[in-house]
Structure formats: structure tokens, C-alpha cells
Amino acid sequence: MLKNRVKELRARHGYSQTDLATLIGVTRQTIGFIEKGELSPSITLCLRMAKHLQISVDELFWLEDEEELT
């Protein structure tokens, strides 16, 4: 499962879901689904989010350790 820090970093930068969505060209609902882990974004969206949140993609998104699943 893909984990992320989008909500945390979005808030740190003072962006609403709508603000971030507008910056990267998606809907507010898309940001909500990504934050809840219900949608895995494309690499293009990952790169856009990382750019606007001033963080590397691997610090923003990571795969949940498979050992935690067992």
C-alpha cells in the first residue's frame, strides 16, 4: 500500500485541498482521495505535488513495509 505525507505537508505550507489541487491541476476530491490512501497518484502528480510541497517524492510517498502486513 502506498503511504503519504500529503495532508501533513499541505497543512504545513498553509494550502487547503483546493489550493493544492489548483496548483497541480486536479480536483479537491482527488487530493482528498490521495491523502486517505484511496487513490495512488500517477508519477506526474507525485512530481507536481513534491515540487509544490518542496520535498522529494520519496519523502512524500513510500510503500508500506510488507512485513507490517503479516
Model region roles, listed by residue range:
Residues 17, 28, 46:
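Helix-turn-helix DNA-binding elements, focusing on the entry/boundary residues of the two helices
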Residues 6, 20-21, 31-34, 60:
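Conserved hydrophobic/aromatic packing and binding residues within compact polymer-binding modules
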